[in-house]
Amino acid sequence: MSDGQVLTAPIIVSGAGVATTARQLLTEVDAQKAGLSQSLKRVDSSAAHLCLYLGYKADAGTLKLPTANWWYYPAEYDHDALTQRFSLDPNAEFPVIYVSFPAAKDPTWAERFPGRSTVEVITVAPFEQFTPWLETRWHRRGDEYEAKKAEITERMLGKLYELEPQLKPHLEHCELSTPLSTRHFCNYEHGEI
């Protein structure tokens, strides 16, 4: 702990991810005992991601939000090729878009937040596209970063509105997190999902 206190347990269950657990939460000796040090040498970081958090000024019923998640894949479906293309060209088509409708799935949502709904839109993003801002601070990354986020946001909204066009006039809040946001808040080195 930051105050020097050490917590021990015979069994550790971590939701921080195996790499973060082994490299930041365990001592090197404990990571070796658990067989994680050798295993991690063979494991790459998971994909970094972008997440668009959307708030709508209408309830899920009015918006006709589905209670299932959407997975959108381009018609030319070769995931590896699309992912590779997107990693080289940030303007290439997104290789996958995942859309979730939390407000429609929570039976208590309408009671707790009347007249409001949320949607999340997620896709992969190469961490390297954000390394120019690696040494900057959250909310202080500069105009170029904000312009990049705005362009990505518009592209992601465009895909969402192809699937759910009725949402467009009701948008009230929109915020995009990047791999740097995930790094900042979750301490995942490469903004992994």
Each predicted region: which residue ranges?
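Short secondary-structure junctions and interdomain/linker hinges
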Residues: 57, 61, 106, 128, ...
